[in-house]
Amino acid sequence: MDQLSDSYALYNQPVVIDNGSGIIKAGFSGEERPKALEYCLVGNTKYDKVMLEGLQGDTFIGNNAQKLRGLLKLRYPIKHGVVEDWDSMELIWSYVLNEVLQLQNIGEHPLLITEAPMNPLKNREQMAQVLFETFDVSALYVSNPAVLSLYASGRTTGCVVDCGEGYCSTVPIYDGFALPASMMRMDIGGADITEQLQFQLRKSAGVSLFSSSEREIVRTMKEKVCYLAKNIKKEEEKYLQGTQDLISTFKLPDGRCIEVGNDRYRAPEILFSPQIIGLGYDGLSDMCMQSIWKVDLDLRKPLLSSIILSGGTTTLKGFGDRMLWDLEALTKGTSKIKIIAPSERKYTTWIGGSILTGLSTFQRLWTKKSDWLEDSTRVYSNLM
């Protein structure tokens, strides 16, 4: 594949997009943090307008839709890491690129974008087609988010545990080489915790918050009060004994306050015990161990001592402690296990993309639009 010229790379700063199910992060190569942090949602007004003044338009995108959620019916284009609503996805990309990043011509910039590991090839094909044809990007690279998170950590070896809004994955990488046969994924993430909390609140507190706008309220509640218990059985015993520090109060937008008790740790427990919601996955700790056990025997020790957390869901209180507790139990104390939890792990995927696209050695990896036009099938297989 032809390299982009040095002048091309110099005068056309690459754009980096971490295309998350919950929040889309976007910005320019070489910068320390993303310039755009927008909720990945689109909202349409659900009421008839009766006055000329007030809000203009009937479609709102990203953070604007989040702010006006009470007036809107919200749509989430990405479900479990897969784009299901391409029209809404295009609206979000257009808004982020043109309005937030204020790009005059996206076609003059190479674009790195993330895609969940083990996604259907059809999703990547559609993504490439939309970005090349609709947005006219000049060059494209589609990356595994876990690989970028490892770049951001400054390491070349580690098992990346990436948990976002739509899915969780475990990706072992050794000395810069991804080990695809050992990658694992489960389609449970932060959105499922939010949904579980919705059901539990109705059952335990009689609070019904099920509209698309109310779902965002519950998402905020999850982020503020939920946590992972290190030992779920002991936590249940403490709760039954009436321990008051396990109860948290959350204020709803209408001023009502509700007490959240054992739902605080029961809702996120689905990550580690998916059978709670009737799914057959083994749980995140088991999945991490299975990924590492799939690699060659000689590679396991350095992977166990470099387990890197990435994604917004890993910022739940107690997440790292729970992973360590479970993995030490699974290895029966025979291996040294180290959990690495970067303080900015919500953004480490984007930061890794910013670093990667700035390397001179990366320039040969871009897929140019001319290559895609010549042989799109071959190019799809290169967008990894």
UniProtKB/Swiss-Prot annotation:
Effect of residue 371 to A: Lethal. Strongly reduces interaction with JNM1
Annotated effect of mutating residue 378 to A: Temperature-sensitive. Reduces nuclear migration in mitosis. Strongly reduces interaction with JNM1
Effect of substituting residue 136 to A: Lethal. Strongly reduces interaction with JNM1
Subcellular location(s) per record: Cytoplasm, Cytoskeleton; Membrane
Keywords: Cytoplasm, Cytoskeleton, Dynein, Membrane, Microtubule
Result of altering residue 73 to A: Reduces spindle formation
UniProt cross-references to SMART domains, sorted A to Z: ACTIN
InterPro entries the UniProt entry points to: Actin, Actin/actin-like_CS, ATPase_NBD
Similarity comment: family membership: Belongs to the actin family. ARP1 subfamily.
Note: Present with 1580 molecules/cell in log phase SD medium.
Subunit relationships: Self-associates to form an actin-like filament of 8-10 monomers. Component of the dynactin complex composed of at least ARP1, JNM1, NIP100 and ARP10. Dynactin comprises a short rod of the ARP1 filament attached to ARP10 at its pointed-end and probably associated with the capping protein at its barbed-end. The rod is implicated in dynein cargo binding. A sidearm formed by NIP100 projects from the ARP1 filament and is implicated in motor binding.
Role of this protein: Core component of the dynactin complex which assists cytoplasmic dynein by increasing its processivity and by regulation of its cargo binding. The dynactin complex is required for the spindle translocation late in anaphase and is involved in a cell wall synthesis checkpoint. ARP1 forms the backbone filament of the dynactin rod structure and serves as the scaffold for the remaining subunits. Required for proper orientation of the mitotic spindle.
Identification of the protein by name: Centractin
Gene: ARP1
